[in-house]
Amino acid sequence: MSGWDEGAVFYSDQAQFPRGGPGGDPSADLTRHSALRKFKEFLRGFTGPTGDFPYRESLVHNRDHVTVAIEDLDAFDAELSDKIRKSPADYLPLFETAASEVLASLRSKVAGETGEMEEPASGDVQIFLSSKENCLSMRSIGADYMSKLVKIAGITIAASRVKAKATHVTLLCKNCRSVKTVPCRPGLGGAIVPRSCDHVPQPGEEPCPLDPWIAVPDKSKYVDLQTLKLQENPEDVPTGELPRNMLLSVDRHLVQTIVPGTRLTVIGIYSVYQASANQKGAVGVKQPYIRVVGLEQSRDANSNGPSNFTLDEEMEFKEFAQRPDAYVKICSMIGPSIYGHSDVKKAIACLLFGGSKKRLPDGVRLRGDIHVLLLGDPSTAKSQFLKFVEKTAPIAVYTSGKGSSAAGLTASVIRDGSSREFYLEGGAMVLADGGVVCIDEFDKMRPEDRVAIHEAMEQQTISIAKAGITTVLNSRTSVLAAANPIAGRYDDLKTAQDNIDLQTTILSRFDLIFIVKDVRMYDQDKRIASHIIKVHASGAAASSKNTDASEGENWLKRYIEYCRVTCKPRLSEKAAEMLQNKYVEIRQKMRQQAHETGRAAAIPITVRQLEAIIRLSESLAKMRLTSVATPEHVEEAFRLFNVSTVDAARSGINEHLNLSPDIANEIKQAEAQIKRRMGIGSHISERRLIDELNRMGMNESIVRRALLIMHQRDEVEYKRERHVIVRKA
């Protein structure tokens, strides 16, 4: 049988991937050569809807990277896109090799046409992937997705410094000085170093020992690597659960493109790494992370991007904006289960829509976000409003003042356990960038923590200079805060200064300040009681209609989103002139009031308040999708400003003026008794003094009013949280 195979040539494809096709049949899978060829054909020959060659042109104009849509790969070759989805770690390096080769051939052709034969620039081309598929939930990603392509959305809460990651490590044998280069696994993977040297010893030569290799850093090849921490979007976290985090690894041209607080949509390879080598018996337990191969920053207040409005939705929104009762209808959707408070609802509607951001020629940014403070008695639905806004705003973070520190609200510097380096982690004001921060119990915050949000409220940035990290984070958020007066309830016998225990610096940053009082009126109490009983009685029926309510909330959320993205109104000339006159008039009234009472207003009326009225006017125009704010919008903005901030500034000031002769006489008698009871410099408990004068037949409210007037004349002073009175004169 000799010579039976003469003349035939047999070969084996050594480049076959280690994984075979289904059933272990290698022929059913793509070979390395055929995959490389198909990738080249795709980059060269794929045509867009207009007949152009998008990827070929992209490579010529940008030699470093090219973004490939998986949907285009699907249309070109379904098998190829399937391989990219299921085995991205194997096929993406091939794709990048194909891109480098296509770029080299294209550049040599371009050089040939000009008549100058240049050597084509060789270099690695990074492939970025993009997809229009829906994002997976962070909680749903498990072992089934290992080594596959996944797409998730979230908000960046931390970013590490850039490190150098070796792609090829050069090893030197300590014994025979021979050199070997071994590749490194991409992402957070390391290199596999052989135990023995390849050198064959000569007769009489001592063989190389085990583990003879030492790394030569100067001869190794590196790429930039950065790790990010991605957290679930606040609106996606189930109630009562902590938000989940995912570690991301970005390299080459993706490093230093993301700052904490940025909302991202990420495509990457779900991988694992060994977190710590010190854990005994945990060799098989690995930590998951995502090696990013494509990311997209979400625009404005929408984690899915603003382009996902259908034509039907846009038509519906535009029709709604043309309705004469659009403003009233929107306000009725704010807190529908809350009775009354129509002006507060209108203010919250303005806060949700926001004004227009502006950038001046000298680079200064003027904020468009509106801040609202609700100050008043308990059980006046303040927290209900905050909870409603948290559900309705496209981006919202809810926090309580007592449980919030300065670092938790702004940003903290944390030391990484493994690398011992510091990195930034954004707080509530950073995470809500482009949305609303709801702060309950605002008055219970420590003053040093409250000061931390001054810059975030006006300049819309947070400056950090800690542990060698000096940076500025964006914090373009609206603040909706709720607070109680000093004594828990608003005391009409006290001035606004005595009721509001907040500094002027923080009060001037709020555009609207509402004093919400629990007024005891028979008819109103009856209507409120009837409304609350109906809400509770129809609870069972309402649960079946819950879908309708949630649909209404979703519609409002989408409408707010659409208005914020598409409409940027500006003031008309008539509106600007009217605004100027009204502002000067308000300042004049406040100056006159301060002159009459001898005390400055508790809530200052400054240029910030003028800007607040401009923002309110723009917000009212934005609700109607109009590009110009008219005098009618300015009129309504002034009305809101008058019933909130101006009323709050005036409240309690003239309480002791224009008293009836009988009451004035009683107050004088009370003052005389107080002076007889207390010598100059002596002190007494307020409660004890009131009880003693009560036993003498004096009304408690008269005694309190007398103390208030004496305090204003600086004759008595309060100490120990207003529990003790000291007579001064």
From Swiss-Prot:
Any GO CC annotation of this UniProt entry: MCM complex
Enzyme Commission identifier(s): 3.6.4.12
A Pfam cross-reference name: MCM_N
Catalytic activity: ATP + H2O = ADP + phosphate + H(+)
Entry-linked InterPro entries: MCM (IPR031327), MCM5 (IPR008048), MCM5_C (IPR054125), MCM_CS (IPR018525), MCM_dom (IPR001208), MCM_lid (IPR041562), MCM_N (IPR027925), MCM_OB (IPR033762)
Locus of motif Arginine finger: 508-511
PANTHER family with a match to the protein in the record: DNA REPLICATION LICENSING FACTOR MCM FAMILY MEMBER (PTHR11630), DNA REPLICATION LICENSING FACTOR MCM5 (PTHR11630:SF42)
This protein's name: DNA replication licensing factor MCM5
Organism: Oryza sativa subsp. indica
